[in-house]
Amino acid sequence: MVLRRLLAALLHSPQLVERLSESRPIRRAAQLTAFALLQAQLRGQDAARRLQDLAAGPVGSLCRRAERFRDAFTQELRRGLRGRSGPPPGSQRGPGANI
């Protein structure tokens, strides 16, 4: 509790904040933070641009991609169901089913 108050008092001191901001480790940490934020922003803009280009492309290619995804998904689902032993879930009727 005392340590918390001491740190709060020190961090609210303009002279200490000024001296810390001039120190090499704090400046380096600020540079790295700014670099990381800028890189994240640029990557986000690039991803948004690629999505816009994809959406603005021919509708036929988007439909083909959706069909390929649907076909691959149904194939994997069927393969997975074939690999299971026993009745499919929900096929039993009556009390005590699927216990």
From Swiss-Prot:
Cellular component terms (Gene Ontology): mitochondrion
Annotated spans, Disordered: 76-99
Q: What else is known?
A: Induced by hypoxia in cancer-associated fibroblasts and promotes tumor angiogenesis by causing increased secretion of VEGFA which leads to endothelial sprouting.
- This chain's protein is named Protein NCBP2AS2
Question: What organism is the protein native to?
Answer: Homo sapiens (Human)
The upper taxonomy is: Eukaryota, Metazoa, Chordata, Craniata, Vertebrata
